[in-house]
């Protein structure tokens, strides 16, 4: 994963990323607050279920793609055996 490094200090990098996240997400929170105020308990439970279900699916996808990328890496043992044969 490519990570942008803003400064040499990891804590400052974390704060910059946190600030960028807050700036990006704040309009969504502000615009959706009216809808949140009118939400019933049933709606909240349904939303929690959807969020949890989405998280589980993303978790599974992450590990599937991690396994696929590991399979694409060349096997170091085979390259070592080839070097010994030569």
Swiss-Prot record:
Report the InterPro entries cross-referenced here.
T4SS_TrbE
- The main place the protein resides is membrane
**Entry keyword set:** Cell inner membrane, Cell membrane, Membrane, Plasmid, Transmembrane, Transmembrane helix
Cellular component annotations (GO), alphabetically ordered: plasma membrane
Record localization: Cell inner membrane
Keyword Cell membrane belongs to the record: yes
Instruction: Give me the segments passing through the membrane.
Output: 11-31, 45-65
| Protein's name in the database | Protein TrbE
């Amino acid at each position: 994963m490519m990570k942008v490094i803003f400064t040499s200090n990891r804590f400052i990098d974390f704060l910059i990323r946190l600030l960028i996240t807050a700036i990006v997400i704040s309009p969504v929170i502000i615009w959706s607050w009216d809808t949140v105020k009118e939400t019933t308990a049933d709606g909240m439970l349904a939303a929690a279920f959807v969020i949890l279900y989405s998280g589980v699916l993303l978790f599974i996808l992450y590990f599937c793609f991690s396994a696929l990328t590991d399979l694409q890496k060349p096997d170091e043992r085979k390259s070592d055996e080839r070097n010994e044969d030569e």
